[in-house]
């Protein structure tokens, strides 16, 4: 089932750590990406903009296959 705008999601560790995006940045991803709820605030093509509200952090673009419903 595809992820929709406004849905609560979390990142899938295995897919994010082994992605092309991970090779371009620091691979020490913070735990909140995998353990807390994030809200999908926008979707463009294969990417979703996710806002994690538990901690004061910037929104992050993740591929749709790197997130799952929480």
Swiss-Prot record:
E.C. code: 7.1.1.-
Pfam families attached here?
NdhO (PF11910)
Which domain of life does this protein belong to?
Answer: Bacteria
Q: Which GO terms describe its cellular component?
A: plasma membrane-derived thylakoid membrane
Q: Which reaction does it catalyse?
A: a plastoquinone + NADH + (n+1) H(+)(in) = a plastoquinol + NAD(+) + n H(+)(out); a plastoquinone + NADPH + (n+1) H(+)(in) = a plastoquinol + NADP(+) + n H(+)(out)
Entry keywords, A to Z: Membrane, NAD, NADP, Plastoquinone, Quinone, Thylakoid, Translocase, Transport
User: Does NAD appear among the keywords?
Assistant: yes
Query: Does the record carry Transmembrane helix as a key word?
Result: no
Any idea which GO molecular function terms this record carries? oxidoreductase activity, acting on NAD(P)H, quinone or similar compound as acceptor; quinone binding
Enzyme class of the recorded protein, top EC level? translocase
* Protein known as: NAD(P)H-quinone oxidoreductase subunit O
Q: Point out the gene that encodes the protein.
A: ndhO
């Amino acid at each position: 089932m595809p992820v929709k705008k406004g849905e609560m999601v979390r990142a899938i560790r295995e897919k994010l750590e082994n992605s092309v995006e991970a090779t371009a940045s620091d691979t020490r991803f913070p735990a909140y990406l995998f353990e807390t709820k994030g809200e999908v605030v926008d979707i463009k093509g294969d990417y979703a903009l996710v806002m994690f509200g538990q901690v004061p952090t910037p929104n992050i673009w993740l591929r749709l296959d790197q997130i799952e419903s929480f």
